[in-house]
Amino acid sequence: MGIFSKPEVIILKESNSAKEYLELLEELLPKASEEIKSKIEKEIIIIKAGIAGENNILFELKNSNMDMYVLQDIYIETEDGRGAQIDFIVITEKITFFIECKNLVGNIDVDSKGNFVRTVTYGRKKYKEGIYSPITQNERHMEIVKESKLENRNLLAGMIVKKSFHSLNRSLVVLANPKTVLNDRYAKKEVKEKVIRADQLITTIKKIVAESRMPSLSKKEMKEFAESFLKKNQENRKNYIEKYEELTK
């Protein structure tokens, strides 16, 4: 790979459909009945937290001092209609990272079986609840991306994609809330490597890239690769439309 005169972070897509959804909710709020208002207000809090978390990650990426292409909020569907909403796709010279942003309130414990438990404190009381594994969620997204890449390819090209996919692509779950404490003392090594705090993101990316034995891409190849994801992106977000329709019922 040719050496860049200066490391360059290129944000190929920064727009976030969550912001558009937030605007819809804020517009709807004053017109809503009291019963619906409560649901909308809770949804607004959740969406604002998610946007703040993604902004934290975007800040880290923009200041990474690395050569990379960044795409935010990408939605990819397979031909049979299964979809994956990916918070960030980051293309570096050797590895592409699929980043799931979690701006969770409370502290997170991960046990030896990979179970995630959140503890939230209200006053003097502590409440614990199990949450769906963000690792499983992100890896399912990656499987959908892989299957979308296999579509319309011949047998040989498909075999190459299958063989190289997990060597070239990595899943990272980033806890974007700076107040969240992550307790992964009993978690397996592979879990610890996939769940990190936002302030560990760039160090983690640099370490994985440095340890990779994959050949380096040129800047032109990185751009073409990033643009291939952008071409697959669909702006019609079923998840937000369905949420909005549910709130307005």
Which residues does each PLM region occupy?
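Surface-exposed interaction regions that form or flank ligand-binding interfaces
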Residues: 1-84, 95, 121-249
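Phosphate-centric recognition/catalysis
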Residues: 87
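Active-site beta-strand-loop-beta-strand hairpin of nuclease catalytic cores
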Residues: 90-118
